[in-house]
Amino acid sequence: TMLLAGLKSGELDLGIGRMSDPELMSGLNYELLFLESLKLVVRPNHPLLQDTVTLSRVMEWPVVVSPKGTVPRQNAEALLQMQGCTLPSGCIETLSASLSRQLTVDYDYVWFVPSGAVKDDLRRGVLTALPVTSPGAGEPIGILTRVDAPLSEGAQTLLSAIRKSMPL
């Protein structure tokens, strides 16, 4: 990815992201910040919320999901597979949070999304999480730095602020 390439070339001092393939992480340090769960979200007045929510019922509605090959997509497919479900044909595949949010807020779409991407929308009541539990503790999100290069004072100050802002 561009983040890993930028770190390895020295163009970037640090990055924050998901844990990658261990082969791609050679030469980099990884410090876990938090685990991010997968959420299934809808608009607050979505018809799904009027009855018992099951994954098979969710799959009767239009779905927005990350493209194949992404970690959120893999997590969505694992969740569905555990319940004997598959993504409906014709689901929207996009990395655009703004498009996904718009489809979910304005229409009856169900969005499979990492929790951090919709934290504020959930808190403000713009979106509602369906009562569906995703498998595992969540995706590891952390700080990436180069093994062979000390961080500048500014980068160290930034990392200190990031660490202090993380919940225990």
What residues fall within each predicted segment?
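Flexible hinge/capping segments at coil-to-helix
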Residues: G27-V64, K68, R146, E153
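Secondary-structure junction motif
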Residues: L48-L49, L55, P62-Q83, L151-A155, ...
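Short beta-strand-centered segments that line the small-molecule binding cleft or hinge
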Residues: T1-L38, V42, T128-L130
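Short helix-initiation/N-cap motifs at beta->coil->alpha
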Residues: T1-A5, I92-R101
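Short beta-strand-to-loop elements that line the ligand-binding cleft
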Residues: V65, T86-S96
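Hydrophobic residues within well-ordered alpha-helices
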Residues: G6-K8, V58, Q102-D108, I143
